[in-house]
């Protein structure tokens, strides 16, 4: 019997060995194709590309005159200028600017640009506040002087006055060998006019190193690498089949049988994938509902801006920072989004990849991952509900936008599934596909290391499979396809870039930052605990539930060496993926909280596993289950000890979006902490009670499956928050309502932001009843103003901001404008007015004084109130100072009194009928000019007149106020006013909320000049976008600050008057100059060619 059994067992083994021996051709194909794919993939970064070259030459068209050419890299590769001395001789006695790379009156122009300037006594060549050479004008106008030569390259900046000698008799030249002296260029600007004289020339080589496309050779290599890799993987699959065992992968690769044939579709689709449960319906509905009403992620505007600009630029530039360098080597996902912008820029469309990723994650979890964790998990309905609810709650705060964490979560899950499939069937093809998936996941973003963690977690079993197979077919036929699979991503990453350009882009990002060391990883968890949007209720729960389930599972698995019906190998590998990811995240350059979205899928699987591990069938002692319930209550207390905040416009109308949630004055966190204390105390009692105590029906119900209940509760809270926001905001802007309107062509926030194009047009006419009694301030001051004067405003009072020294980037022109008017205004005021108000038409009254303080009062004349209509919903008073008012962010802000009193017609005279406290967005910034808003809807329809009543009863010098007359502004939507064709600098935070506005583009190294700038709310502008887009960091504000003047416009959020939605700024040009015409060409560059380092130094 033993010999017969041994003979039957050895027969198939000999057959398998014979099959492997006869597969010589397949082995050679796998080896050669794999090596070819590997070599071609690795060679791709080194192969040549075709660069689009661009030169800026001046003068243009044979005429002298300024031209604009703002470089996206800010500085050129090199710059040369030649100025004949005859040009200096022909200049007027006062001199002027011969040439400059920026307007002389631009912000910090001397600090950034190069100038050749002639004064009455000298000729100066200056560069970035450094005097390169200064020569007396009389020497330059002498016959000996021939020309002035200026060069600025990586070798330094030098000036040479050809024909002149220094005191030692040497040629008169000077300079500094500093590559950081290369000037910023936004054009060529001059005071010269007329035909261009012979010999006057400026030439700048624009840095277009990133504007490349593959050569034919490189394109063939990319195609060859991809084809060879596919062939190698097919050959590896063929080698896998030689063991004579079937698999799902084998079934899928067989020729399809007709679906109508018996069992055709059933053989094509596994049984587990053909079911549809209530859990599936809830998850799918949850994802679809959240896609419409849910909050977006923090960087959606940033990523959409890059995607919208990429097609025109010719590459995926990091548009807002880092000198326009590309996102490579982590950017292929953004290129997918760039392709999607050809269809639409609407939020619902652009966020489809994350929606699809979430749905696929659930299908993989429910059909592949949970069954792999063992029969106990597969058979547990609470486990499936736990996975579903945790997936939703982890996805909602992190992965409902354009950020790539959702794609990475899917990539990591696919990698894990393929690794498990490889082990289940002892096949290497799934492992090779897992390597491909991990490589492409890592190519999305550095945090794609989570997929690498999945490979590492399954590395040992895969190595055992490799060793077993190598004895049969050799090493190279197995290793070569793996090498090709792991490196084929290079053909995508370096498709249109080279090794040199990607290294330079990486250097720029690392040098400028943020680029934090591995030992600062604690910052990520610190930000999560702060009471900010990054540490909001939803974000805390999305990660902390995963962490709690992870450590609980580790503790139980270590205590219980064997748990019936739980697969230890897959379970430990799942935990290894999460622990490995936490470790690898230490080495990512940024420490943002939104990276926790990576854990959404594996966290859901961990929640399912933990649900089984803490169930009564595993934890039989109620003490342990109650301890876990107490831990859940503590987690909820920690999660609720913050705001219910969501990013930017997603928070509009959401309850408690800027405060800790409360019920009847008691914080929800306190309630959950009390429940934690009760549960922990009961668990402690159970520890000392007899072992069978505490097994009542209530305790068993509470502790059987708490994870899906808690996660389901939190999912309901998130959805309810968004629904409440929509209801409270309707019919004005909310995230969900905007998405609904997108189906009929809505333009997001641009439809609801109202712009006042002409602030001088809406002033009301004062009634003449008391005109003979008006004081020196006219109708604004009324009959007897006390303490108000035409100049009662301190210097440097600007619109919607507080002046800080030194000035921040992105500030308005009024920060640097003269603080006094040269001609007094209509009532003698010399104070500049904001928002384009004309002092010749608009009076001013204020209480600020540096002398003795007094209590001040003002009651203006009555102003005729137009009849109400939908086009004029507001009465506005432009004011400054510490004023009592209401705002969405701060509620009621105490201060001095500025109210609007309205009147009804009476017998022979107007009858005051009530007063209105203003909606004041900037009450916490008392020095700022702003528009106080009084909604017409809150006034009686038969009110016929209004007047301003102002009282400054404080004797503190800082408690001053200033007012202008009331007006009824004529408003237009931002979409109507700005439109969809004018170039706009859309700050990175606002891009997704304004999908119809045209972002300023760039191509061939030159940026488009914007007409407007749209910013987020005051705090976000000051702390986030102004600093991030600073020219010092290679941002777009380096262009606009130097070339343009910004003026904030009066804007309002429709029917949400007390909300600071952001701002619209209009740009005025400093110099009326046309765009420069560039000399374009092409050049073939090797993968190692570099024009030198981008200037990022001070």
From Swiss-Prot:
Induction: Positively regulated by the transcriptional regulatory protein EmbR. This is one of the targets of the anti-tuberculosis drug ethambutol [(S,S')-2,2'-(ethylenediimino)di-1-butanol; EMB]. EMB is a first-line drug used to treat tuberculosis. EMB inhibits the transfer of arabinogalactan into the cell wall. This is Probable arabinosyltransferase B. Arabinosyl transferase responsible for the polymerization of arabinose into the arabinan of arabinogalactan. Belongs to the emb family. GO terms for cellular component: peptidoglycan-based cell wall; plasma membrane. It is found in: Cell membrane. It is an enzyme of class 2 (transferase). InterPro entries: Arabino_trans_C, Arabino_trans_C_2, Arabino_trans_central, Arabino_trans_N, EmbABC_dom1. GO terms for biological process: Actinobacterium-type cell wall biogenesis; cell wall organization; response to antibiotic. It comes from Mycobacterium tuberculosis (strain ATCC 25618 / H37Rv). Changing residue 497 to K: Resistance to EMB. Changing residue 328 to Y: Resistance to EMB.
């Amino acid at each position: 019997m033993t010999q017969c059994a041994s003979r039957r067992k050895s027969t198939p083994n000999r057959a398998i060995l014979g099959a492997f021996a006869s597969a010589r051709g397949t082995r050679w194909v796998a080896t050669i194709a794999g090596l070819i794919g590997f070599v071609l993939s690795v060679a791709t970064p080194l192969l040549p590309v075709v660069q689009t070259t661009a030169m800026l030459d001046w003068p243009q068209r044979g005429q002298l005159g300024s031209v604009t050419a703002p470089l996206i890299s800010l500085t050129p590769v090199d710059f040369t200028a030649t100025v004949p001395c005859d040009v200096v001789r022909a200049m007027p006695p006062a001199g002027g600017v011969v040439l400059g790379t920026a307007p002389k009156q631009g912000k910090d122009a001397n600090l950034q640009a190069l100038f050749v300037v002639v004064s009455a006594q000298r000729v100066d060549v200056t560069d970035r506040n450094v005097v390169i050479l200064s020569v007396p004008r009389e020497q330059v106008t002498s016959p000996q002087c021939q020309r002035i030569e200026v060069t600025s390259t990586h070798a330094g900046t030098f000036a040479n006055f050809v024909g002149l000698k220094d005191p030692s008799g040497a040629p008169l030249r000077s300079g500094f060998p500093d590559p950081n002296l290369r000037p910023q260029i936004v054009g060529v600007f001059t005071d010269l006019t007329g035909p261009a004289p012979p010999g006057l020339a400026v030439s700048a080589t624009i840095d277009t190193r990133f504007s490349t496309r593959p050569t034919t050779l490189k394109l063939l290599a990319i195609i060859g690498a991809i084809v060879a890799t596919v062939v190698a993987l097919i050959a590896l699959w063929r080698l896998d089949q030689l063991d004579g065992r079937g698999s799902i992968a084998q079934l899928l690769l067989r020729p399809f049988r007709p679906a109508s044939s018996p069992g055709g579709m059933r053989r094509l689709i596994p049984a587990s994938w053909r079911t549809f449960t209530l859990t599936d319906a809830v998850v799918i509905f949850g994802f679809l509902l959240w896609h419409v009403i849910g909050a977006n992620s923090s960087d959606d505007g940033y990523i959409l801006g890059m995607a919208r600009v990429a097609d025109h630029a010719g590459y995926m530039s990091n548009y807002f920072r880092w000198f326009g360098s590309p996102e490579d080597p982590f950017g292929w996902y953004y290129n997918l989004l760039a392709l999607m912008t050809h269809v639409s820029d609407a939020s619902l469309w652009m966020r489809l990849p994350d929606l699809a990723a979430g749905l696929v994650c659930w299908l993989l979890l429910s059909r592949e991952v949970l069954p792999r964790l063992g029969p106990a998990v597969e058979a547990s309905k609470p486990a499936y509900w736990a996975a579903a609810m945790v997936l939703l709650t982890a996805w909602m705060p992190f992965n409902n936008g354009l950020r790539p964490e959702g794609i990475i979560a899917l990539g990591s899950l696919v990698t894990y599934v393929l690794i498990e499939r490889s082990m289940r069937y002892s096949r290497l093809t799934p492992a090779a596909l897992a390597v491909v998936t991990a490589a492409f996941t890592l190519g999305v973003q550095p945090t794609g290391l989570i997929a690498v963690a999945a490979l590492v977690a399954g590395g040992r079993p895969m190595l055992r499979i490799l060793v077993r197979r190598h004895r049969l077919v050799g090493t190279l036929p197995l290793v070569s396809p793996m090498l090709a699979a792991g490196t084929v991503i290079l053909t995508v990453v370096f498709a249109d870039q080279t090794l040199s350009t990607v290294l330079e882009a990486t250097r720029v990002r690392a040098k400028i930052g943020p680029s934090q060391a591995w030992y600062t990883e604690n910052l990520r968890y610190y930000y999560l605990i702060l009471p900010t949007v990054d540490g909001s209720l939803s974000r805390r729960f999305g990660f902390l539930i995963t962490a709690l389930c992870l450590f609980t599972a580790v503790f139980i698995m270590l205590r219980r060496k064997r748990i019936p019906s739980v697969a230890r190998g897959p379970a430990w590998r799942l935990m290894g993926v999460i622990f490995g990811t936490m470790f690898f995240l230490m080495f990512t350059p940024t420490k943002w909280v939104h990276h926790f979205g990576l854990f959404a899928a594996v966290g859901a699987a961990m929640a399912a596993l933990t649900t089984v591990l803490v169930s009564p069938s595993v934890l039989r002692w109620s003490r342990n289950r109650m301890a876990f319930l107490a831990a859940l209550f503590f987690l909820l207390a920690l999660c609720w000890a913050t705001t219910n905040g969501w990013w930017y416009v997603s928070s509009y109308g959401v309850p408690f979006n800027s405060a800790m949630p409360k019920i009847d004055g008691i914080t929800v966190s306190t309630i959950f902490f009390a429940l934690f204390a009760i549960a922990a105390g009961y668990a402690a009692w159970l520890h000392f009670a007899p072992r069978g105590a505490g097994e009542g029906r209530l305790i068993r119900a509470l502790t059987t499956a708490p994870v899906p209940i808690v996660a389901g509760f939190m999912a309901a809270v998130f959805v309810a928050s968004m629904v409440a926001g929509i209801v409270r905001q309707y019919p004005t802007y909310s995230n969900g309502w905007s998405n609904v309107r997108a189906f009929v062509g809505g333009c997001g926030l641009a439809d609801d932001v109202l712009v006042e194009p002409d602030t001088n047009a809406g002033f009301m006419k004062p009634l003449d009843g008391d005109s003979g009694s008006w004081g020196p301030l006219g109708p604004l001051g009324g009959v007897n103003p006390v303490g108000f004067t035409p100049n009662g405003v301190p210097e440097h009072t600007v619109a919607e901001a507080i002046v800080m020294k030194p000035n921040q980037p992105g500030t308005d022109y009024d920060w640097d404008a003269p603080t006094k008017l040269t001609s007094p205004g209509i009532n003698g005021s010399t104070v500049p007015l904001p928002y384009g108000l004309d002092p010749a038409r608009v009076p001013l009254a204020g209480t600020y004084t540096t002398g003795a303080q007094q209590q001040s009062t003002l009651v203006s004349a009555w102003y005729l109130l137009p009849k109400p209509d939908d086009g004029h919903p507001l009465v506005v008073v432009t004011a400054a100072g510490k004023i009592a008012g209401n705002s969405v962010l701060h509620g009621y802000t105490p201060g001095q009194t500025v109210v609007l009193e309205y009147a009804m017609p009476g017998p022979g005279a107007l009858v005051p009928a009530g007063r209105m406290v203003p909606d004041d967005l900037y009450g916490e910034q008392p020095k700022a000019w702003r528009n106080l808003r009084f909604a017409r809807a809150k006034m009686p329809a038969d009110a016929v007149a209004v007047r301003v009543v102002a009282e400054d009863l404080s004797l503190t010098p800082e408690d001053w106020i200033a007012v202008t007359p009331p007006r009824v502004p004529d408003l237009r939507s931002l979409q109507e006013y700005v439109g969809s064709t004018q170039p706009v600098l859309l700050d990175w935070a606002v891009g997704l909320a304004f999908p119809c506005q045209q972002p300023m583009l760039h191509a061939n190294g030159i940026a488009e000049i914007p007409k407007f700038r749209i910013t987020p709310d005051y705090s976000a502008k000051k702390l986030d976008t102004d600093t991030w887009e600073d020219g010092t960091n290679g941002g777009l504000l380096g262009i606009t600050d130097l070339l343009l003047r910004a003026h904030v416009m009066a804007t309002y959020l429709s029917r949400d008057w007390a909300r600071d939605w952001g701002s619209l700024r209009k740009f005025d040009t400093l110099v009326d100059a046309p765009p420069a015409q560039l000399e374009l060409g092409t050049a073939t560059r090797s993968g190692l060619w570099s024009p030198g380092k981008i200037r990022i130094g001070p």
